[in-house]
């Protein structure tokens, strides 16, 4: 089941949920954002009414994260095999955040990427493959996901590793320019809906304590 087993939910005590809520859901940790034809004063009053009962500060202090490698396998009676390979990434305030985003786009961001061309188009080993870069306050994950069949997984994993290793040798100017253009286009497309705009504003305020101009983001990508 997508949401977990009933036995897991039954094993969670009510007090545990309440303590988690008190620790994580506080006024200092929440950003409420809106985009579009919004009356600011009305919006502020609605937000205050909805969240006025929250405590000002949370009571939980998160421990710093430490990356550690490992391997996890889960056997199921399925025809498909899902493979995820993760490496230590970087925090969202790291100066290399945008270069990492460009690198992820080059490696596995779409049909023109290295992973798609080599592993799906040329070798036909997967039905889906892409890279991802997830950044957090004090670290991150850079990885690759692939969906394949049981008979292909043994050949697939070494090829995935090889494509990641190739990033350390050389990157052509043409594919670098293509990755930058693709990432810039995707970034600009987030401005086309009010939902995406409000989500972006909230995320930037929570991370950087300011709204980052789109021109600044594009400049970092370039």
Locations of the language-model features?
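His/Glu-based metal-binding/catalytic segments typifying zinc-dependent metallopeptidases
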Residues: 59-114
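Short amphipathic alpha-helix segments
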Residues: 114-122
